[in-house]
């Protein structure tokens, strides 16, 4: 379900929140569940959305801006003002498909690095919206991929941890000023 939070989809020269990048320990720490959905949290959601739009992203998890909360914002159509964003509070994966899809991913925390990642094609999640209402969502295609990518951030995992081709990954990271030593491969 789309969010009711209203944020102008525009790029700001100085977004409200600072991104953290691969190699920063903050990205490796698991996020904590959110106990209370209130106006302070809704302001954080607005700030995260504005930061995401300012950086040309389609998804952002709170740990990427140094906040250890289980909070994700997603907008697959950032250029479409009529399409509201998706806000996921304390998301949990209920089910994933057996069908695996390989597609290229990028990340605001690892600028200019794009690599193929295998993920389940369909994912079903439970979460709370920005008003604290429990919701479920079955997602496919790009939305399923984006949800899984952002949920990884909540667990201290970044997409490069899931890349199979370590040689190409090391070259891409080095070319963009990142160290392969910051990668923590997951099975």
UniProtKB/Swiss-Prot annotation:
The keyword tRNA processing does not apply. It holds the Pfam family Pep_deformylase. It catalyses: N-terminal N-formyl-L-methionyl-[peptide] + H2O = N-terminal L-methionyl-[peptide] + formate. Fe cation binds at residues 107, 149, 153. Its EC number is 3.5.1.88. Keywords: Hydrolase, Iron, Metal-binding, Protein biosynthesis. Belongs to the polypeptide deformylase family. This is Peptide deformylase. The lineage of its organism: Bacteria, Bacillati, Cyanobacteriota, Cyanophyceae, Nostocales. The gene is def.
């Amino acid at each position: 379900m789309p969010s009711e939070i209203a944020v102008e989809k525009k790029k700001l020269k100085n977004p409200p929140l600072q991104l953290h990048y691969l190699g920063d320990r903050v990205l490796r720490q698991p996020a904590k569940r959110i106990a209370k959905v209130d106006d302070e949290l809704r302001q954080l959601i607005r700030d995260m959305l504005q930061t995401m739009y300012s950086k040309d992203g389609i998804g952002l998890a709170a740990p990427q801006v140094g906040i250890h909360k289980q909070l994700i914002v997603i907008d697959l159509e950032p250029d479409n003002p009529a399409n509201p964003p998706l806000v996921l509070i304390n998301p949990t994966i209920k089910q994933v498909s057996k069908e695996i899809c390989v597609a290229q991913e990028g990340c605001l925390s690892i600028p200019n690095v794009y690599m193929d990642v295998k993920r389940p094609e369909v994912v079903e999640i439970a979460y709370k919206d920005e008003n604290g209402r429990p919701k479920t969502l079955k997602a496919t295609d790009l939305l399923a991929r984006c949800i899984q990518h952002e949920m990884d951030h909540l667990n201290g995992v970044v997409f490069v941890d899931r890349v199979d081709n370590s040689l190409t990954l090391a070259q891409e990271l080095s070319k963009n000023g990142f160290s392969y030593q910051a990668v923590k491969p997951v099975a």
